[in-house]
From Swiss-Prot:
EC number: 6.3.2.-
Cofactor requirement: Mg(2+); Mn(2+)
Gene coding for it: rimK
Gene Ontology MF annotations: ATP binding; metal ion binding; ribosomal S6-glutamic acid ligase activity
Protein name: Probable alpha-L-glutamate ligase
Binding residues annotated for Mn(2+) 2, in chain numbering: E260, N262
PANTHER family (alphabetical): RIBOSOMAL PROTEIN BS6--L-GLUTAMATE LIGASE (PTHR21621:SF7), RIBOSOMAL PROTEIN S6 MODIFICATION PROTEIN (PTHR21621)
Residues the entry annotates as binding Mg(2+) 2: E260, N262
GO cellular component term, pick one: cytoplasm
Residues in ATP-grasp domain copies: 104-287
Enzyme class: ligase
Family note: Belongs to the RimK family.
Residues annotated as binding Mn(2+) 1: D248, E260
């Protein structure tokens, strides 16, 4: 099998592990920087070039597209799709996952529970908008933030109004959610490949923070996801059209709640903590998908 990995940095842990796993299983693996790909679009066919040469013959493409290059990276991935190349995470699925508002609408439509979420665009409606959510604390999130960036905890109604109105003044897109205090700054990252959870880790926020992202100083330990949590994680990935996903849940009094579905989850944390060959499992999924 000939596999392309769309990645801007071949030295990143996740990219290196996918290369290693693919080659270990006897496949040809090539790294392509999506920003150096260019394409021809016409009724008579689609084509891609890279560094002056046509890109042909790939059986599968694994997107490792960073948030900063989402628009062009997904355009390149879509070109691969139109050329008949399999991908576990299609371009439209990635776009769904990176729009928090759209993702939550899709999850809710499938009966998947999450922190209650509100969204609005009219500054005159701020107080009524927040009343739809309930009393603070509230969590304000930029709609396209990543790795914990653009996430603010407000503990008073006046603070919530102030943050919402400030973000509106900056023409920022954001959502506001209820704060789940019983989670105590912890979440559960479930790594989904295909139709199952292959690894799970519990992430704990650093002292003084409520965001559990490892990039922000959080810690992680191997965890066992309950059957209900596994079901929610798999259904969440499926609802967005993703075959490979990191689904972040919090444990609440009303059961598991989905915080986010990540379409480009890092492998270093989960492989290091859980000792699971996640990269190899992703390659096995490709093999099964294109038989």
């Amino acid at each position: 099998m000939k596999i392309a990995i769309l990645s801007r940095n071949s030295k990143l842990y996740s990219t290196r592990r996918l290369i290693e796993a693919g080659r270990t299983r006897g496949h040809t693996v090539r790294i392509l920087d999506p920003l150096r790909c260019y394409m021809r679009i016409a009724a008579d066919g689609f084509s891609l070039h890279y560094k002056g040469k046509p890109i042909t013959g790939f059986d599968a493409v694994i997107p490792r597209i960073g948030a900063s290059v989402t628009r062009y990276g997904t355009a390149v991935l879509r070109q691969f799709e139109f050329m008949g190349t399999y991908t576990p995470n299609p371009s439209d699925a990635i776009l769904r996952s990176r729009d928090k508002l759209r993702a939550h609408q899709l999850l809710a439509s499938q009966g998947i529970d999450m922190p209650v979420t509100v969204f609005g665009d009219n500054p005159d409606d701020t107080q009524d908008l927040l009343s739809m959510l309930g009393p603070p604390p509230h969590v304000v999130k930029l709609n396209e933030g990543a790795q914990g960036a653009g996430v603010i905890l407000t503990e008073k109604a006046s603070a919530s109004r102030g943050v919402v109105e400030a973000l509106r003044g900056l023409y920022a897109n954001f959502i506001v959610q209820e704060f789940i205090g019983e989670a105590e700054g912890a979440d559960l990252r479930c790594f989904v490949v295909g139709d199952r959870v292959v690894a799970a880790m519990r992430r704990q926020a650093a002292d003084g923070d409520f965001r559990s992202n490892l990039h922000l100083g959080g810690t992680a330990a191997m965890a066992e996801a309950s059957p209900q949590e596994q079901d929610v994680a798999v259904r969440s990935a499926r609802a967005l059209g993703l075959a490979v996903a990191g689904v972040d849940l919090i444990r609440s009094q009303r059961g598991p709640l989905v915080l986010e579905v990540n379409s480009t989850p890092g492998l270093e944390g989960v492989e290091g903590v859980c000792g699971v060959d996640v990269a190899g499992t992703i390659i096995q999924h490709l093999e099964q998908a294109i038989r």
